[in-house]
Amino acid sequence: MVALLALLLGLPPAAARPLRPVATYSIVARDPSTGELGVAVQSHWFSVGSNVSWAEAGVGAVATQSFIDPAYGPLGLQLMRAGRSAPDALKALLAGDAQRDVRQVGMVDAQGRAATHTGALCIPAAGGQEGKEYVVQANLMDKPTVWPAMARAYEAAKGDLADRLLAALDAAEAEGGDIRGRQSAAIVVVKAKSSGRPWADRVFDLRVEDNEAPLVELRRLVKLQRAYNHMTAGDDCVAVADWACAEREYGAARTLEPRHAEMAFWYAVALATAGRLEPARPLFAQAFKADPRWRELVKRLPGVNQLPKDKALVDAILAIR
């Protein structure tokens, strides 16, 4: 049935045999306060996020692991997009999968309905747990305490969905995690409602492909992404000449990443464009010190309307040391 559904939905059928076991712990969740959907995962396997984690705004999220069939991701989303609940979608896919006993899958739909499956032949310790609008699942773990610890950590964590997903991963690692160690991790968070532009609906879409401490690196990337999200919002404010908004967003980015030269530079450009050169001076100085080529970029901006065509202003910026 999985192969038939794939053909009906225009997807190629999965391979006849299962892939190698992607020993994994993951969490799939919907934030009841914002409606955001997300998946976070860690594994002793290269590039775990490229096959395990799937999410679509306004539809649902899927983690497919163990002897992985990646088709559960797009097929699960297709079924949920068509109106099936996460439990119904997972049941339908498992019913037609002759290798269901080696699969481990978690799904949550846009209404928060959740389901998890751990096949009888998943390598132990393996299991899953369903909570309110989330599921956790793990296989090839050091101890069977991993997934209950994930659930407790997620429920107790503060912050937004990304914060809570990361807390669940940290709790899994604290319980021993994958019996073989750690290698890669990923997180994807999408907005509650689809804009019709999938690229604009992803709040986080980050992977650590190969790292001795993937969860540490994933947290670093999440923090950096938060800063860039503020930078993007600042750019949007600049586009409509809302300078107060731009300063607020660029300032938030700088608070998160105070040593980041590019963030300092564009914040300075926004200030200078708004007629506030004095507070822009230390920001330009930071960028120029990091790399003198930022000075050359200043010269190029007025011609493309990214700085006022004001020679005195440009000269004043270039004179900053």
Task: Report residues per predicted region.
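Short coil turns that delineate tetratricopeptide repeat
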Residues: P258, K289-R293
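Register position in tetratricopeptide repeats
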Residues: A239, T273-A274, L307
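Bacterial N-terminal signal peptides
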Residues: M1-G10
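Residue-level recognition of tetratricopeptide repeat
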Residues: D235-D236, V269, P302-G303
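TPR alpha-solenoid repeat register
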Residues: M263, L297-V298
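Alpha/propeptide regions of enzymes that mature by internal proteolysis
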Residues: A16-R180, I187, E209-V240, T255
